[in-house]
Amino acid sequence: MALSANLFLRQSQSLVMTPQLMQSIQLLQMTHFELNQFIAQEVEKNPLLEFPSNDGEAGDERGAGEDEPFGQPSEDAGSDDGADSRAEALSSDWYDNGGSESTGRLNDELDANYTNVFPDDGGPQRLDAPELVGQWKSMPGSAEGADYDLDDFVAGQLSLRDHLAQQIPFVLPDMTDRLIAQNFVDQLDDAGYLQTDLVETGERLGTSLEQVEHVLAALQTLDPPGVFARSLAECLAIQLRQKDRYDPAMQALVANLELLARRDFATLKRLCGVDEEDLLDMLGEIRQLNPKPGGGFEAGVSEAIMPDVVVRPSADGGWLVELNPDTLPRVLVNQSYFSRVTRNGEDHAFLSECLQSANWLTRTLDQRAKTIMKVASEIVRQQDAFLLNGVDHLRPLNLKTVAEAIKMHESTVSRVTSNKYMLTPRGLFELKYFFTVSISAVEGGEQHSAEAVRATRFRALIMQESPDAVLSDDDIVDMLKKGGIDLARRTVAKYREAMNIASSVQRRREKRALAKVAGF
């Protein structure tokens, strides 16, 4: 049979994702910060979109004076009565009158226009920047568009770098040494450890290794003790040296921290050359040291998480679910501007496209809010016991259950719960927190939430251990089974490792050591 090429016609139907549909999907999974940035970009591109003004007036409610050129007097502006009333109003306001007179005097004295030297506009501001009260708290005008709230700095602590910069002049009088020290300060991580190589630093700064080591030795005497260490052992050694407790036995202990992590106390006693009582005293001193000397300082401006949904108890005993108005985007379509400008046929096509895009955006934002409300309301209905009684009553829940209840697709529910937060009487939770896998119950009972088992029952069993009765993974399985929870041993081991809980052998060594320390 010979092979040949032929042409065929076929009709078919398929779904095509339009740009508008892709945009609605993207908006659904955005956080409110990302959404505000996106809307600000759209307002900048689309002349029909605008933010509402603070007094509640926007768009077509600005009045007929919008068509008049700025600074053009109106018809009644030339009347004597209107001029007298305005003059009387100005003269009655001491602040405005005094300000205008002061401005005139400055213009004469500076031989320049005051507004050119000190403009009223402090620089470029975000389109959604707060006004009125917010202007007294914010610091706009950054070239990068940064917008900080002064409330973030009121209760803020001194940063680690600022704290060290205040001490450097007292230990390093030489300016060259101070420059090297500042380079070291810039290389610190949030825990206060130095993340750089001394040889590389010396070559980069064009100085000798001896001078670099001299500067580092001086910096390691600063407060907090242990700062500028390059390892945990060096951090502990610096703190012990400042306490005058860095003797040969303690040096051997610090040099073998891996044995301490394994609770191999027999080997540590032999290496340190001490008996059990002295070793316990040394371990007590180690526990009093700070492994993260820079942890008590602010790393930067704190960023508060704003909830997208707020849940409150209602008067009828249920729950009132509301969208947070502070996170809802506010954007309007200026229909009156479209009607006035489209009288010119040349602009009609462009503005019609802008109007279509603006209407689609507003409908998408409205649909996004309704979808978040539906998903949040169903989550609250499913997790009613958790809101009333706590994490021990958290029910197992998956995306499919919520999607079927609200008649939406699982992917839609997944996008809604991504990076969205709910404020409840129990605290602030991400929406994904309420979705946990189920754990089978013994003899076909009610299933349990994996998060509830980990957070309450599993941890409670570990905390109730005694030095002479440490539970192994098999023991935990048996005790959970008595409580109606069916878990495999490998699942218990996985939960234990995820919660950073040591094995039964290591826990037994640690509890016995702590008991001996408490006994002395």
From Swiss-Prot:
Spell out the Gene3D superfamilies in the cross-references.
Answer: Homeodomain-like, RNA polymerase sigma-54 factor, core-binding domain
What GO MF annotations does this protein's record show?
A: DNA binding; DNA-binding transcription activator activity; nucleotidyltransferase activity; sigma factor activity
The family database entries (InterPro entries) matched by this protein are listed as: RNA_pol_sigma_54 (IPR000394), RNA_pol_sigma_54_core-bd (IPR007046), RNA_pol_sigma_54_DNA-bd (IPR007634), RpoN_core-bd_sf (IPR038709)
**Gene name, Swiss-Prot/TrEMBL:** rpoN
Entry superkingdom: Bacteria
Q: Where is the signal peptide?
A: none
The function of this protein is: Sigma factors are initiation factors that promote the attachment of RNA polymerase to specific initiation sites and are then released. This sigma factor is responsible for the expression of the nitrogen fixation genes (nif operon), GlnA and DctA for dicarboxylate transport. The open complex (sigma-54 and core RNA polymerase) serves as the receptor for receipt of the melting signal from the remotely bound activator proteins NifA, NtrC, or DctD for the expression of the regulated proteins.
Is the Transmembrane helix keyword given for this protein? Answer: no
Protein's name in the database: RNA polymerase sigma-54 factor
Q: Where is this region: Disordered?
A: 49-107
